[in-house]
């Protein structure tokens, strides 16, 4: 029974719950970014380049057994049993990764900026525990009546 109790304590800790929420939101954000890249960013980019659909870019490594090359589409090549290198799908993934990494960078940067402003507001200088000897300029404890360096009397 103690194992269940330990697991319950572990599972309801704030950090574990926060991490679970972060993973769920991150997965949803990843799906949004992938859709943004494949449906919004790459089609106009492909149009600018010359009417290229990135998701259908491929290289035939081996022709299919049922139909010889050329194939009109990736789906046709796959249906014919051709072995293909689908570099267009890889490019989609690279673009998604770059956008996701940039979004995470902006998030971390803004959090760090908030931490810096919070830290500067709460940073109150600690009261000094030393004073300076007026004769030799060495650091002396506040309660000292004589300087340990030059033995001068302090006021």
Curated annotation (Swiss-Prot):
The keyword Zinc does not apply. This is Large-conductance mechanosensitive channel. It comes from the Bacteria. Homopentamer. The chain crosses the membrane at residues 16-36, 40-60, 88-108. GO terms for cellular component: plasma membrane. Channel that opens in response to stretch forces in the membrane lipid bilayer. May participate in the regulation of osmotic pressure changes within the cell. InterPro entries: Mechanosensitive_channel_CS, MS_channel, MSC/AndL, MscL_channel. Keywords: Cell inner membrane, Cell membrane, Ion channel, Ion transport, Membrane, Transmembrane, Transmembrane helix, Transport. One of its GO terms (molecular function) is mechanosensitive monoatomic ion channel activity.
